[in-house]
Amino acid sequence: MSYLRFEKALMTNLQESLPKELLRTNRSGAYSCSTIVDCNTRKYHGLLVVPVPELDDENHVLLSSLDVTVIQHGAEFNLGLHKYQGNNYSPMGHKYIREFDCDKVPTTLYRVGGVILKKEVVFQHYENRILIRYTLVDGHSATTLRFRPFLAFRSVRQFTHENSTASRDYSAVDNGIKTCMYAGYPDLYMQFSKKNEFKFCPDWYRGVEYPKEQERGYASNEDLYVPGYFEMDIKKGETIVFAASTSEIKTSSLKKLFDKEVDERAPRDNFFHCLVNAAHQFHRREKNDDRYILAGYPWFKCRARDTFIALPGLTLSIEENDYFDLVMKTAMKGYREFMQEKPISVHIAEIEQPDVPLWAIWALQQYAKETSKEECLKKYGKFVHEIIQYIEANKHPNLELKENGLLYTNGKEKAVTWMNSTANGRPVVPRTGYIVEFNALWYNALCFAAALAGMQGDETEQQRLLAQAEQTKQSFLDTFLNEYGYLYDYVDGNMIDWSVRPNMIFPVAFDYSPLSQDQKKKVLDICTRELLTPKGLRSLSPKSGGYNPIYVGPQTQRDYAYHQGTAWPWLGGFYMEASLKLYKRTRLSFIERQMVGYEDEMSYHCLGTISELFDGNPPFTGRGATSFAMNVAEILRALELLEKYQY
């Protein structure tokens, strides 16, 4: 039995099949994403979605979808599916689906009368090329396939509508055509492995609707351009490969290329393998060979904080240390440029956020544990030292080392932590002053840097850092630990935030912590009682004021809920780490039960990955981005920790 397989009953029930999405990426920034019944429900959905750096830094939907029609004895059966206004779906091709399986590659089996047609999809690695293989498994009569492409040529942030500006020009290429709707865009090549006839009959399909955008309070409909259709006969047992790309390909190579791409795919036959596949989808390799971690799909770009938090789990936890080095090399170059006040040459957003250097050291600490401190010192010791010096010299524009040894930051006017939602131009959660995880990270960084200095034989520097850490530890306890046994979220003069928030889990989970064992247990206990859900830790306790756990509605409504009670799986990773460190093997069964909630997500929402956040109340529905790097990373890291404690 396949791990990710759905039968006819589910596939033909749109209430069950439409919420399930599927993502494929090329590891260079392009992706293909839709629902498992190929009905686009978001403006971000498309069969071929690619970066167009000549225009902007967004992805662009070139090919929205490809409708296939089976023709026998003059009767036509369209396998496509689109939603139009008024809850109208057409042409209802999902009713022909018999099963869907995506253990290795997404495979859909259609049955139309005596015809059984199999469709398999792969996205070629490092190329802007989607490949679809059609196989006529059975057919008792002469069969013709008609392919009708729906084109958008627009940013994922926008919509397209019928207009007179769009070019209808096209040129014949090897077994296909190339076309480009607007200046500045690359040509779209649509080719087949078999000779075909292209019928030019341009038309606009009007009023295609995307219900997910409607739910999010945005405009939700557009018009899609269809230049015509391709037709060809297909015999029983025959395969035809379709390619959509921004470059031409020799069509005689398509079948071998498809086989090669399939052979390179790892099966998604269990929870771990699904997460490994998801981890690879966040990879982005640029033409200059810079490597990045994308924060999530379908709308996030590369962000500095997300990169350093996600990097260990997405690489070290799946034994891909080399990719850690490649990403760290790129990120390190960018952060050194930032520290030296030079133009940033890498494509990493939010590199100026004050906790970024602290998370960078945390990531390198994980590298040291996975390899060795000697290896880390050799490759990254200088970078750690540079960061410590930079912070101590108060050169960061929004991070000040105070005389008490704590780090102070100004977050009143602009969000400066991972709780970064804003409304009306101001932070919804104005975390400012002494921020609990910033200072836990700082203490951890000082101790780790001291350990590296000791290995280097620099005893003077080691003792200096340890003395600084001791001062930070005492000030941390004096500032954050309250009479009820948990930690204030932030403190700024007389302003003390008593809210029970998950940021206090970090000093419990870190290798170097200012908290004693008893203090850690009290903090963990409160997190368990008030914040823990099957999908991670809530961003705010239900007992705290302003609890707003359901992430739905227009932008402003969602912004106010974003960090006010929603649950975040990546925080659950740190929670599980803290639990295992404190209670070791006695918590194994408890942590294994926690993993069930994350494994359930493999067959919901975006298959084989984990959504950005979840409602904080049952049934803990997945929301936000359909695949989120920090969530996948921290669950992978927790799985690795779980395995280490089991043996």
Indicate residue ranges for each PLM-predicted region.
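Aromatic-rich carbohydrate-recognition surfaces in CAZymes
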Residues: D138-G139, T160-N163, A172, I234-K236, ...
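Carbohydrate-binding/catalytic loop surfaces
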Residues: F282-R285, D289-C302, Q340-W359, A363, ...
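Inter-helical turn/loop segments and adjacent helix faces that build the functional surface
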Residues: S252, Y367-K379, F448-R464, D518, ...
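Non-catalytic C-terminal accessory modules of carbohydrate-active enzymes
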Residues: N78-V105, V112-I116, A393, D525-K535, ...
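Carboxylate/His-rich catalytic cores and anion/metal-binding grooves
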Residues: A244-H280, I309-P312, E319-K329, Q517-E530
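Glycine-rich phosphate/pyrophosphate-binding loop
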Residues: F198-M232, W418-V428, T432, K543-D559
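Terminal accessory carbohydrate-recognition/targeting modules of carbohydrate-active enzymes
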Residues: M1-P267, F271, P298, E320, ...
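Catalytic cores of carbohydrate-active enzymes
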Residues: H273, E392, L399-K402, Y443-D525, ...
